[in-house]
């Protein structure tokens, strides 16, 4: 764990939604609660109301796309982003946020980029967080194949971008909810708290 303060440790508790149509949303909720956030599972547009931040978890991107279409969530998700509230996308969540899907982040994701035969692997990556590298777990992961000038690349694996930030949006190709290291979620929650303070 880093020396980052747990959001919610001071002041009013922040509320973070986790898109819960499919994928590893429960594990994200556990980490967020451990760090002091109030968590709501998001399945329909009304669930976005009153949230300070949102997580799009890993899972199966085609299934997630169908769920977003079925529940008419695409425009509400874009509006949530337009309001300046932070969003965190992991693995399939990164794919959902790219140009070819929700169009929220100026990136193009390459699905299953490390090869379908490589089901999972773990490597240390440097994100500039206190405490040193993060043990990043990749499961049939994408990478960022292309990005616009406003996108900051935060980490690479074998020369391929696997973590990035654009404005209030953080995306990673790995599964930070699985490794037992809460620092990436803490980084996101700090941005949520900062955004809420700025909007106050």
Regions flagged by a language model, labelled:
Residues 1-70, 79, 182-200:
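N-terminal beta1-alpha1 cap of cysteine-dependent amidohydrolase-like domains
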Residues 1-10, 143-200:
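C-terminal and late-domain segments of enzyme folds
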Residues 21, 92, 174:
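Cofactor-binding loop segments of dinucleotide-utilizing enzymes, especially the Rossmann-like FAD-
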Residues 38-40, 135, 152, 170:
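Conserved beta-strand segments of alpha/beta enzyme cores
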Residues 55-57, 88, 138, 171-173:
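Structural motif
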Residues 60-126:
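Cysteine-nucleophile active-site neighborhood
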Residues 100-160:
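Pocket-forming structural segment of enzyme catalytic cores
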């Amino acid at each position: 764990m880093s020396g980052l303060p747990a959001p919610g440790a001071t002041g009013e508790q922040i509320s973070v939604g986790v898109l819960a149509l499919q994928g590893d949303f429960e594990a994200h909720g556990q980490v967020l609660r451990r760090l002091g956030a109030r968590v709501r599972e998001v399945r329909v547009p009304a669930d976005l109301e009153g949230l300070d931040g949102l997580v799009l978890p890993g899972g199966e991107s085609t299934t997630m796309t169908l769920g977003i279409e079925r529940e008419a969530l695409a425009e509400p998700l874009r509006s949530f982003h337009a309001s300046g509230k932070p969003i965190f996308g992991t693995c399939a969540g990164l794919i959902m946020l790219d140009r070819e899907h929700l169009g929220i982040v100026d990136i193009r994701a390459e699905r299953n980029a490390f090869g379908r035969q490589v089901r999972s692997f773990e490597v240390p990556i440097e994100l500039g967080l206190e405490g040193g590298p993060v043990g990043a777990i990749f499961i049939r992961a994408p990478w960022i194949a292309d990005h616009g000038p406003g996108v900051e690349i935060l980490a690479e694996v074998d020369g391929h971008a696997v973590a990035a930030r654009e404005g209030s949006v953080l995306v990673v190709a790995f599964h930070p909810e699985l490794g037992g290291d809460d620092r990436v979620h803490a980084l996101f929650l700090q941005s949520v708290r900062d955004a809420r303070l700025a909007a106050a």
